[in-house]
Amino acid sequence: MNNVFEIINQARRKNKLKRELQDNQKKIRDNQKRVVLLENMLDYIDPSMTTAEVITIVQNMKGDYEDRVDDHIIKSAEISKSRRDISRKIRDLTEADKKANK
């Protein structure tokens, strides 16, 4: 019976991680879009139109968004690994429970 509770607990954790992974992937997409936007802005901004400081600011913003994308990609990999570990544990617990009930 303890295995049943553990299986339920692990399944809930797995589902929570799945939702977190989806949320993280959305953040990756959003930040990648921002990077593209800023790249396009850099194509249109000209020193004669604005000051060189504006270009520097936009470049810094672009770098910040790229760093965020990298951070979210790393976080997604960590979450995926946790989900795989939980799936493996659920499978092992289920098999052990089946053997114990035979």
UniProtKB/Swiss-Prot annotation:
Cysteines paired by S-S bonds: none
Coiled coil region boundaries: 7-34
Pfam family, one: DUF496
Gene Ontology cellular component annotations, sorted alphabetically: cytosol
Record family assignment: Belongs to the pole-localizer TmaR family.
Alphabetized HAMAP family for the sequence: Pole_loc_TmaR
Protein name in the entry: Pole-localizer protein TmaR
Organism of derivation: Aliivibrio salmonicida (strain LFI1238)
Gene name in the database record: tmaR
